[in-house]
Amino acid sequence: MCGIVGYVGFRNATDVLLDGLRRLEYRGYDSAGIAVRTPEGLKVVKRSGKLSALAEAVGKTPLQGALGIGHTRWATHGAPTDPNAHPHTTEDGRIALIHNGIFENYLELKEALEARGHRFRSETDTEVLAHLLEETYRGDLLEALREALKAVRGAYAVVVAHEDHEEIVAARTVSPLVVGLGEGENFLASDVPALLPYTRRVLFLHDGDVVRLTREGVEITDLEGRPVQREAVEVDWTLEAAEKGGFPHYMLKEIYEQPWVLENTLGGRLREEEGTVELGLALDPREVDRVHVIACGTASYAGLYGKYLLETLARLPTEWDVASEYRYRDPVVDSRTLALAISQSGETIDTLEGLREAKRKGARSLGVINAKGSTLTREVEDVLYIHAGPEIGVASTKAYTAMLAAMALLAVWFGRGRGALALEEAQRLLREMRRLPRLVEEVLEKRPLVAHVAEKYHQARDFLFLGRHVQAPTAYEGALKLKEISYIHAEAYPAGEMKHGPIALIDEHLPVVVLATKGPLYEKTLSNIQEVRARGGKVIAIATEGDEEIPRLAQDVIYVPEVHPLLAPIVSVVPLQLLAYEIAVLLGRDVDQPRNLAKSVTVE
């Protein structure tokens, strides 16, 4: 998501900041800014749009100083405008800060701060921290940051500078932050590429770390002020490898980014006490009688998951269409139909054409989109952004889980708005949704087990994926991932359909991946597993942690944490992504750019 750079040393800070931000452009952004400590005080320049606009503005008013912070922003709270760009400052302009992540409780903090006389100049969640720092600062910048962070809730990487201090202070929780160690200078960045021209000796900060950087050294403590030690490492990555975060492929990096992507998708939107979500939509849920989901590929499976949730939680009739077929079937549409278009890129031509057909017939429109400024964002009435950040790997991973989370948010929003979802059940769902980032982190720890399963089955010529209810789309997505990057033939079916044809394929050579997490249809899924075993099939089960029945039936079991059955696909798809990845690597495939595929399909 956002790019962060900080510098204290002997060089021209402006040059270091702009160079570092350029090296983080691959993360995506819609505005940029820097703050430099000059002899005249702290000076801030920020612009919406590309870095070139910022560089041009800085060129007109050069900032001379050897300490500064810089930021590229991917908008979450507030439009991509100059006032909403970072850095943000205290009202007296003496403290500047940059922030990656989301402060979930910013609205209540903002109301309290305004009641105490603070005046806000932006629409961002970040600015609340600037005002909190104004209250907590009493001469020690690091202590002021620690005290201010006690009030906020959410994911963050924060970097702060003060015009009276020859130091930068920073803190992180969930959002990444790395320290670069130099001689007579030190650096901060959200990712290693920004540091490579200056140093290869780095410290990776951990959750809860708070750091003070001066020219002479680095001091790290926890949020309570207790000293902590972080081991310095030498990175030998090329720039390309650094952009991959040290992972061998973008796809694997993006799989591992899913916990903080979910933080971004959900952050600031959950209102557990009220049992609702804040989506900022102009749409009135009571004016919609039916939904038409229009999407392609991975996005279409997220849409199918959305269909299950919209009908279950909101009692809202929902049709699901592959976008390339939608406009050719002459769909029945009226003014109370909502066309729900889902696309990572916002440029998928079949989705755009399907949306245009629905609008031509009078439908309302809502886009679930990752890429801001895309064609789809301009053609829909309302947008629900998934905030997944740039996805480089052709095979979608983090955008898919973000889309699933967005579908869950939308279903709760419709359910509460239409009076179909009880307060207690909504609160339960929202509490479970808040756990999702941590649960996905737990699943990622299972990678060695998934790699072992991949080793056993990577020579198979065919795979079958089975799932029921909300896990049927998970099966479809698992099969698609395997096909896309390993080139192994894979099919997916609702598990109850197996006996209506696919069962003829089952023999001792066919691995069958079964989504068998706990839920209302668990026992029926066990029966399907027994049917596979009776015909010699090899079962790879995705099961709920603690399930003692599954190991008696399946050759291989990959456990995922227990979660609300309607949210199980968000944790269950992760081992399927890893399985596809590990098999493709074993087969020597080009994981990030598989043959014949494009990231964004812009031709019919």
From Swiss-Prot:
Residues 281-420, 453-594 form the SIS domain. One of its GO terms (molecular function) is carbohydrate derivative binding. Keywords: Aminotransferase, Cytoplasm, Glutamine amidotransferase, Repeat, Transferase. The keyword Repeat applies. NCBIfam families: glmS, PRK00331.1. PANTHER family: GLUCOSAMINE--FRUCTOSE-6-PHOSPHATE AMINOTRANSFERASE, ISOMERIZING, GLUTAMINE--FRUCTOSE-6-PHOSPHATE TRANSAMINASE (ISOMERIZING). This is Glutamine--fructose-6-phosphate aminotransferase [isomerizing]. It comes from Thermus thermophilus (strain ATCC 27634 / DSM 579 / HB8).
